Amino acid sequence: MYILPAIDLKNGEVVRLVEGNYDNKTTYFKDPLEVLDFFIESGSSYLHVVDLDGASDGETINFKTIEKVIKKCDLFVEVGGGIRNEDTIKKYLDIGVKRTILGTAAVENIDFTNNMINKYKEHIAVSIDSRDRMIAVKGWKEINKQDSVEFCMKLDSMGIDTIIYTDISKDGKLSGTNLDIYKELREKISCNIIASGGVTFEDEIIKLRDMKINGAIVGKAIYEGKIDLKKIIEIAKQ
């Protein structure tokens, strides 16, 4: 298992939202390069980056900022937010992004998703963001009525390499993640699963690791000093 520290970008700044609410945000750094050095020094091999403006508007608003991050580090970087066509996938892969994350596009256009999975294979992940088991899209502003676990099973049958699953109700609250949903997912799908949303405590990392979850995205818990990044990276590897 591996840890992906998170950088969420809004207008080029590193922020965290609570339950995906764009009006409830905290700005931690004006420049993502400030926190990138800390991630590298802590032993990170992976980085999760989200263009929050892109997730909401469907445009790659923070592309130049993300390109700056890529040039500064040698990490495995995955990027999501506003990736809704193949040109954007190519654009990110061309600057050195290792994995591009489909969200809204995956839910709203399953044929496109299937084509991208077949063409780009491990360079494509799908992010499933769930509220009360239903899928949220467009920066979590709209609820799609599909059952999130059933949709994950559909993606798994299509050959998706990696699913990132977020329980929105837990996100940004520092109250822990939804371990039950990851247990259910691991029992029902065989692809790689990355846990996201509310991961706050060391014992959660141990439990996720032991249930064979492949990765965990950690954001606010790092920024607020609730968790030791260096330590959880080592725990995840055990």
UniProtKB/Swiss-Prot annotation:
It holds the Pfam family His_biosynth. GO terms for biological process: L-histidine biosynthetic process; L-tryptophan biosynthetic process. Gene3D superfamilies: Aldolase class I. Keywords: Amino-acid biosynthesis, Cytoplasm, Histidine biosynthesis, Isomerase. SUPFAM superfamilies: Ribulose-phoshate binding barrel (SSF51366). InterPro entries: Aldolase_TIM, His_biosynth, HisA_bact_arch, Isoase_HisA-like, Isoase_HisA-like_bact, RibuloseP-bd_barrel. GO terms for cellular component: cytoplasm. It comes from the Bacteria. The active site is at residues 8, 129. Its EC number is 5.3.1.16. It is found in: Cytoplasm. GO terms for molecular function: 1-(5-phosphoribosyl)-5-[(5-phosphoribosylamino)methylideneamino]imidazole-4-carboxamide isomerase activity. PANTHER family: 1-(5-PHOSPHORIBOSYL)-5-[(5-PHOSPHORIBOSYLAMINO)METHYLIDENEAMINO] IMIDAZOLE-4-CARBOXAMIDE ISOMERASE. Belongs to the HisA/HisF family. NCBIfam families: 1-(5-phosphoribosyl)-5-[(5-phosphoribosylamino)methylideneamino]imidazole-4-carboxamide isomerase (TIGR00007). This is 1-(5-phosphoribosyl)-5-[(5-phosphoribosylamino)methylideneamino] imidazole-4-carboxamide isomerase. It comes from Brachyspira hyodysenteriae (strain ATCC 49526 / WA1). The lineage of its organism: Bacteria, Pseudomonadati, Spirochaetota, Spirochaetia, Brachyspirales. The gene is hisA.
